[in-house]
């Protein structure tokens, strides 16, 4: 049995509620309000897993005929996932407000707490119709002034302010990765009971790797440091790296990052010259910050090439950034090429 894996006997599994009640990420019990919020999010993801699995059988595939705040075509499941998550957490007394990739403005919640929830309800939704793994990404912040009315600026905190982050990937299994700032753990959904059960209690990313993920069709548009790194990987043993690499690309960030957390590697979605005024494609608050929190807590690194993602100060709720994350030795090399 590999280190960090839980024995397969059903009597030894720990469910999500039991885990939250027992963990002490800062030497003290996890606040009840944070437990309640995370349980509400995860219970909703359990329901969403069922909806995703039914797909065409209940008429949920295909475009919805609407667009989101980003100007992107919404899939039917995008809207359903967004509505499910909002409904699922509205009753949390510890929640002050939420923000979604699918909505222009944050939504106040009639709770008395000081937690803020940000989420991408269904990452990779362009892959729904071809049955590729998709997922939900979430991040939790603390409101700096609990007594003040909710404002968009309350959410504009760097990734270092996250108190929890995770994703749920809907694939052959429904699996969740979670960090509370003290390492990364993984759970798998028991679809009979609806419970998420702990399967790995210490997820780590190897410092070295021979695997990278990037959309190679855009190579001609990349900046020189990224092109140099990828060209060296492609050269393999005959080039400067003196080892062969494999390339992977799913076009679903949640699936690509899940692979990095599971077996190491590098995921890259860099700036390109087609839209030079935009620093990147992926959303800092809903996708990149929570994934970077997970990657750092697993021993990896996440950067935009020059700065660590977690240190970036956001200026817009829907801000986009470039990102390169994963195994430390490779990301350090990419950062060096940018210097």
From Swiss-Prot:
One of its GO terms (cellular component) is cytosol. Keywords: Carbohydrate metabolism, Cytoplasm, Hydrolase, Magnesium, Metal-binding. The keyword Secreted does not apply. Pathway: Carbohydrate biosynthesis; gluconeogenesis. Pfam families: FBPase, FBPase_C. GO terms for biological process: fructose 1,6-bisphosphate metabolic process; fructose 6-phosphate metabolic process; fructose metabolic process; gluconeogenesis; sucrose biosynthetic process. Mg(2+) 2 binds at residues 120, 123, 287. It comes from the Bacteria. Mg(2+) 1 binds at residues 101, 120, 122. The keyword Membrane does not apply. PANTHER family: FRUCTOSE-1,6-BISPHOSPHATASE-RELATED, SEDOHEPTULOSE-1,7-BISPHOSPHATASE, CHLOROPLASTIC. This is Fructose-1,6-bisphosphatase class 1. It comes from Polynucleobacter necessarius subsp. necessarius (strain STIR1).
């Amino acid at each position: 049995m590999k280190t960090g894996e839980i024995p397969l006997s059903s009597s030894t599994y720990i469910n999500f509620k039991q885990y939250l009640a027992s963990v002490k990420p800062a030497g003290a019990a996890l606040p009840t309000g944070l437990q309640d919020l995370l349980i509400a999010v995860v219970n909703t993801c359990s329901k969403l897993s069922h909806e995703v699995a039914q797909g065409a059988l209940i008429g949920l595939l295909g475009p919805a005929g609407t667009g989101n705040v980003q100007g992107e075509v919404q899939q039917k499941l995008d809207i359903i996932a967004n509505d499910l998550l909002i409904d699922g957490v509205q009753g949390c007394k510890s929640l002050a407000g939420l923000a979604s990739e699918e909505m222009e403005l944050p939504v106040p919640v009639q709770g008395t707490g000081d937690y803020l929830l940000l989420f991408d309800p269904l990452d990779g939704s362009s892959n729904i119709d071809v049955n590729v793994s998709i997922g939900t990404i979430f991040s939790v912040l603390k409101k700096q002034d609990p007594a003040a009315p909710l404002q968009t600026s309350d959410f504009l905190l760097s990734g270092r302010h996250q108190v929890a982050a995770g994703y749920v990937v809907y694939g052959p299994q429904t699996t969740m990765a979670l960090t509370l700032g003290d390492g990364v753990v993984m759970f798998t959904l028991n679809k009979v009971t609806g419970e998420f059960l702990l399967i790995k209690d210490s997820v780590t990313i190897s410092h070295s790797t021979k695997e990278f993920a990037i959309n190679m069709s855009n190579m001609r548009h990349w900046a020189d440091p990224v092109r140099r790194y990828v060209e060296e990987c492609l050269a393999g043993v005959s080039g400067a790296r003196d080892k062969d690499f494999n390339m992977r690309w799913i076009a679903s960030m949640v699936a690509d990052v899940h692979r990095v957390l599971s077996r190491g590697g590098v995921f890259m979605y860099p700036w390109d010259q087609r839209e030079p005024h935009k620093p990147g494609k992926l959303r800092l608050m809903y996708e990149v910050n929570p994934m970077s929190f997970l990657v750092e807590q697993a021993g990896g690194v996440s950067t935009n090439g020059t700065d660590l993602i977690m240190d970036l100060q956001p200026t817009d709720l829907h801000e986009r950034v470039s990102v390169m994350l994963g195994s430390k030795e490779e990301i350090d090399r990419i950062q060096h090429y940018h210097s």
